[in-house]
Amino acid sequence: MVDFKTVQAFDFQGKTVVLRADLNVPMKDGVITDNERILASLDTIKYLLGHNCKIVLLSHLSRVKSLDDKKGKKSLQPVASALQNLLKNTKVHFCPENTGDKVKVAVNQLPLGEILVLENTRYCDVNEAGEVVKHESKNNAELAQFWASLGDIFVNDAFGTAHRRHASNAGIAKYIKNSCIGLLMERELINLYRLINNPPKPFVVVLGGAKVSDKLQVVNNLFKIADHILIGGGMVNTFLKALGNEVGTSLVEEDLVQTAKQILDSDKDKKIVLGVDQMLHASFKDEPGVECVVAPQWPAELQGFMSLDVGSKTVALFSSYLAKAKTIFWNGPMGVFEFSNYAQGTLAIGKAIAQNQQAFSVIGGGDSAAAAKQLQIADQFSFISTGGGASLALIGGEELVGISDIQKK
């Protein structure tokens, strides 16, 4: 049940709307390589434009850590251009600033039915002297008040940052009278709440990716709601080491080995299922690997090798659980997905989930979503989230602090 006010709660006619969208798209040399997040924000933008209002659009792009980062390579200008190409009949303006009098003037002069994209909100994380001040990322009150002062109504549609308390989401909501969530945010919450509120059983979760630390909270919370937690990717090595298995030079979070052991010891119902074999290579290279069964000791010729993907036995094991599932949540690749030799595990798991058309299946963003796209099976999943970290936080039982100050119904 989504208890926040939605866009349907307000009359936007003639108003100035501050819209926080998640337009954090991947770029290479100033060119957008995947516009999925821009496309995902269009429903809300078009809804607002249909109600004849001004839109002041805020978004972050990547992390900004230096003055060099503010010299154009992390600018939202290409995003504004992409938006203009998608909204042929709407004028999209770009403002190279995001605070100060120039912004106020630009907002005041903006005609109804047009959009003003302000510069990357994270430019405010580095001041003019080059000091890292994190005014956006640490929810600076003065910055939040300035952005709140620009509009009559705040619409937060940036699910990707819903788990972060930033000036451009939580901050604005605190200092503006009227606020609501956008259509994308509403869709995300409805689908993800289906996973945690009495999901059809069996509920199978697939976790991958490099780090255990990112997913510890989730694993602990999932014990309460999931039937099986399948663990692959780099994070499985920390669990395998905790059980006394050989991991060679694989990625392991040494400081969490003991924590992983405690999690496994407390798993009385044996909900956690670890990979049983791995694809190994002598170094971190995209070259064919060797399949090896998980064991306390690897063969002598594989000493010092590292795991770069799950093996075929793990794929078969995980697929057997996924075939019987009624609810599935998948977050994180099974191996080094960007290497073609080590993308097979991730692609196979994607196929296994897509084949189970009886299940309510959700992908938690990131590389898992990229895998579904690569396989051209994205439409066979019930829902693909736009926010990997935010979806994990919600499934992990955390409060989404970036939206908690939005007005309730």
Curated annotation (Swiss-Prot):
Subunit structure: Monomer.
Gene Ontology terms for molecular function: ADP binding; ATP binding; phosphoglycerate kinase activity
GO BP terms in the entry: gluconeogenesis; glycolytic process
Binding positions for ATP per the UniProt entry: 215, 338, 365-368
Enzyme class, broadest EC rank: transferase
One Pfam family, short name: PGK
Subcellular location: Cytoplasm
Family as reported in the entry's similarity comment: Belongs to the phosphoglycerate kinase family.
The enzyme's E.C. designation: 2.7.2.3
Keywords linked to the UniProt accession: ATP-binding, Cytoplasm, Glycolysis, Kinase, Nucleotide-binding, Transferase
Keyword Kinase listed: yes
Major location (coarse): cytoplasm
Cellular component GO terms held in the UniProt record: cytosol
Protein's name according to its UniProt entry: Phosphoglycerate kinase
Catalytic activity: (2R)-3-phosphoglycerate + ATP = (2R)-3-phospho-glyceroyl phosphate + ADP
InterPro entries, sorted: Phosphoglycerate_kinase, Phosphoglycerate_kinase_CS, Phosphoglycerate_kinase_N, Phosphoglycerate_kinase_sf
This protein's pathway: Carbohydrate degradation; glycolysis; pyruvate from D-glyceraldehyde 3-phosphate: step 2/5
Recorded superkingdom: Bacteria
Residues reported to bind substrate: 22-24, 37, 60-63, 122, 164
Species assigned in the record: Mycoplasma pneumoniae (strain ATCC 29342 / M129 / Subtype 1)
